Amino acid sequence: MIYLITGGERSGKSSFAQKLALELSNAPIYVATARKWDADFQNRIDRHQQERDERWTNIEKEKYLSEIDFSQKTALIDCVTLWLTNFFVDHKNDVALSLEEAKKEFLSIASQKDTNLIIVTNEIGMGVHASTEIGRKFTELQGWMNQFLASNADEVFLMVSGISVKIK
């Protein structure tokens, strides 16, 4: 099964996703896609790791999720926005190339046998309009990837103020 959890910043996506993962498995995998850009990001990563107990296996993977064996496992991937940022930066803001590579990676993990994937993403297009060209390009990339993920997901939840709304 593929579950997509989307919503705005601090809407409760990660908490909902973690609860779902623990309902599906006694030993879920947590895949963090954040790149360690600076000390602040490292502190954020450390804090998030401390929030999860011994039931979780933590994996840090910036881009190539297909290198992880998800077969017969439940995995929470948090989050698509940071994952896409890594492709976008590495491909010098090339939307088409970033989207193509991210889709390819997703299809690779989605085809693994007997896997529960819980994917957290952000609806950044619902917020303030980006003031820079790069910001607008990234918003488009995120929107197109979210549409692709939602079309491939079995269930999609929109988080609003800590409340989950099933939309698919």
Regions found by a protein language model. Give the residues of each.
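Short, well-ordered beta-strand core segments
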Residues: 28, 75, 155-157
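Short, well-ordered alpha-helix to beta-strand connector turns
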Residues: 25, 56, 72-73, 114, ...
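Helix-adjacent hinge/juxtasegments
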Residues: 54-101
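Conserved P-loop
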Residues: 2-69
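Structural motif
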Residues: 4, 76, 118-120
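Short, glycine/serine-rich, charged loops/turns that create anion-binding
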Residues: 9, 35, 81, 124-125, ...
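Residue-level signal for inorganic ion chemistry
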Residues: 17, 48, 76, 122, ...
